[in-house]
Curated annotation (Swiss-Prot):
Alphabetical keyword list: ATP-binding, Cytoplasm, Ligase, Nucleotide-binding, Purine biosynthesis
Protein name in UniProt: Phosphoribosylformylglycinamidine cyclo-ligase
Catalytic activity reported: 2-formamido-N(1)-(5-O-phospho-beta-D-ribosyl)acetamidine + ATP = 5-amino-1-(5-phospho-beta-D-ribosyl)imidazole + ADP + phosphate + H(+)
Gene responsible for this protein: purM
Chief localization: cytoplasm
Subcellular location: Cytoplasm
Species this chain originates from: Parasynechococcus marenigrum (strain WH8102)
Annotated GO biological process: 'de novo' IMP biosynthetic process; adenine biosynthetic process
Pathway: Purine metabolism; IMP biosynthesis via de novo pathway; 5-amino-1-(5-phospho-D-ribosyl)imidazole from N(2)-formyl-N(1)-(5-phospho-D-ribosyl)glycinamide: step 2/2
One Pfam short name: AIRS_C
Amino acid sequence: MDYKSAGVDVEAGRAFVQRIKSSVEATHRQEVVGGLGGFGGMMRLPAGLRQPLLVSGTDGVGTKLELAQDHQAHHNVGIDLVAMCVNDVITSGAQPLFFLDYMATGALSPDAMAEVVEGIADGCQQSGCSLLGGETAEMPGFYPAGRYDLAGFCVAVVEENELIDGQQVQPGDAVIGVASSGVHSNGFSLVRRVLAQAKADRSTLYGPDQRPLIDDLLRPTQLYASLVKHLLSSSLPIHAMAHITGGGLPENLPRCLPTGCRAQVSPTSWARPPLFDWLQSAGGIPERDLWHTFNLGIGFCVVVPRDQIDRTVAACRAQQLQAWPIGSIVEGNPEDGVIGLPD
């Protein structure tokens, strides 16, 4: 008996590393020291920083992975993994520096795993961060053959005196909602139940334009790193930012607000994408659950002074992202919920 007969193919693992090497190295910023193969990835801090704060975040893709693996959308979930981490850390105004990934699988499928890493590298390049390292664990008997799980870890940096922590938010500020690319990577346990109930498959179309349902559900999470970089370089006075993930607007928008402030949102200020209408109709999902599970078309929020609405919306659209003034800040407290949305 040897390791391969026990289910772990070391040679396939080595071949996999060689296959992904060029994709990984293409993400490396000039601050990266060394290459693949060491025990730890190394990176210098960007030059010129005076009081740098490191901002870290970790996340996964959740059960979207099951749907993606059923339909071989491996590249997409690689992008999702980066987006779920990067979109969190940039809310502080931080610049993504590097990313690490962890993949665990029952049996190594070099083609599928390479597509995942190429997706991760794609997401890193879009975000301006280096894919500094990772781990691929082949765990036969623990995970089913042909299935894998993902986790990601991102580190970003911001000057301490440029940190965006929500403390500048005040009543009268405006809330700008930036469009999502779809469901993103939250709520897929519910999505999969709806698909099963509706007996939906690859041929299912939805909405007035009869779009392919599965393709739209598996569209990668929108990355907002280049948008935030553009907003900051435009010298816009950003008071707070929020990444709209699990819990939707009602649970994520209050997270960026200080004591004494509460958000008020008008649900009719943007058009809800038909994809969410299909999910609600096919699954009989109550309106409250819909709001507290999905982003409903708003993937990121920016809080700015009211006189900066037009500049902020224009800056978003310059990055090919739709944006709308969706609400305002009023007196109150974040824990009291968002006025205008289901509690």
